[in-house]
Amino acid sequence: MAQPVYSWDEAASAGRNAHRMLPGLLRAYFEEGRALASQKATPQELHRLRLATKRFRYTLEVFRPCYGPGLDARLAGLRKIQQQLGEINDCAATGRLLNEHLAPRSPVRARLERFLRARTVQKIAQFKAFWQDHFDRPGELERWTDYLARRTTRRTSAAPRPTAGSAPSAS
């Protein structure tokens, strides 16, 4: 697989850089997500995917002006993945707090651990189902790639902008 392009071309527009860089970042993100959604991933591995999701979403948000509102549905899907993975991480973090603050043989701790295990299993199942439905459908990677690789158009306003030293015309 070809390595994604991560370097910014200062001579190119933001749209041109997006067109050049984002498809590779997308493929790397989908590859990681698919690997973890199709196996028995640990909460720690899923937390790393959450961080990767956050980085990828923030990167796309930087380029939103190049793509316009059509990018919003894709960003919403990434936000949902990030939220689901955050809930899994919350269960793991709560489990660590139980270890630190409750006696090992405490009945309260045992009940809370059972609850957290069940909730973690439930949240992982929800994440995997959402990933399957929204990111792993047949052709989904190609749809994302086509969208991000499309040539972005420069937006221009209807009225010309005044140049330095020129006065706006009175109409």
What positions do the PLM features span?
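Function-determining surface determinants
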Residues: 1-171
